[in-house]
Curated annotation (Swiss-Prot):
GO terms for cellular component: ribonucleoprotein complex; T=3 icosahedral viral capsid; viral nucleocapsid. InterPro entries: Cucumovirus_coat, Cucumovirus_coat_Asu_sf. It is found in: Virion. Residues 1-28 are annotated as: Disordered. This is Capsid protein. GO terms for molecular function: RNA binding; structural molecule activity. The N-terminal arginine-rich stretch does not seem to be the major RNA-binding region that allows formation of an infectious ribonucleoprotein complex. Keywords: Acetylation, Capsid protein, Ribonucleoprotein, RNA-binding, T=3 icosahedral capsid protein, Viral nucleoprotein, Virion. Residues 11-21 have a biased composition (Basic residues). The modification N-acetylmethionine is found at M1. Capsid protein. Probably binds RNA and plays a role in packaging.
């Protein structure tokens, strides 16, 4: 055998696959794989419910519809005598109203009682004619006609009544941001005079995203 044949035979011997089989996986490896799968499933579950810029949390409990965000405004009613009424039109910031053709899907009102609250109030939101002066007589008639849902909020010893919010769905009406000035929050103080330091109303307006919505709403 010449030198070239010897070299070739050596190479062939080196290319032979190594005999034998891998050792069986240890129980630690199996446990690690199971744990990894569980963590992966958990992460997917958490990610599905996690708010994002495009799908923020609506009032901390329900996610906005895809492609929507929301703008919040706070109303603090003045003193309302027993059996009297208060109304305030929805006035959004200029940075939002300049996109007046963006659709509005829902309005949510949350009642936040302050420590001195000890009354019963009725709260609703209504579309109000531009000519309306939101007088006591006009607001009283709107509460009486049953044309929109009414939240009855009563004093609770715990400080917060379990049902402290309601949704007003505008999807079928094709309302837009420009229409919001036609809507008003109405309050009726039923059993007692409502003082200025007893109640705060948070109004959350869910609307199509606008270019200025670069961060999650607070």
């Amino acid at each position: 055998m010449d030198k070239s044949e010897s070299t070739s035979a050596g190479r062939n011997r080196r290319r032979r696959p190594r005999r034998g089989s891998r050792s069986a996986p240890s129980s630690a490896d199996a446990n690690f794989r199971v744990l990894s799968q569980q963590l992966s499933r958990l992460n997917k579950t958490l990610a599905a419910g996690r708010p994002t810029i495009n799908h923020p949390t609506f009032v901390g409990s329900e996610r906005c519809r895809p492609g929507y965000t929301f703008t919040s405004i706070t109303l603090k009613p003045p003193k309302i005598d027993r059996g009297s009424y208060y109304g305030k039109r929805l006035l959004l910031p200029d940075s939002v109203t300049e996109y007046d053709k963006k659709l509005v899907s829902r309005i949510q009102i949350r009642v936040n009682p302050l420590p001195k609250f000890d009354s019963t109030v009725w709260v609703t939101v209504r579309k109000v004619p531009a000519s309306s002066d939101l007088s006591v007589a006009a607001i009283s008639a709107m509460f009486a006609d049953g044309a929109s849902p009414v939240l009855v909020y009563q004093y609770a010893a715990s400080g917060v009544q379990a049902n402290n919010k309601f949704l007003y769905d505008l999807s079928a009406m094709r309302a837009d941001i420009g229409d919001m000035r036609k809507y008003a929050v109405l309050v009726y103080s039923k059993d007692d005079a409502l003082e200025t330091d007893e109640l705060v109303l948070h109004v959350d307006i869910e609307h199509q995203r606008i270019p200025t919505s670069g961060v999650l709403p607070v």
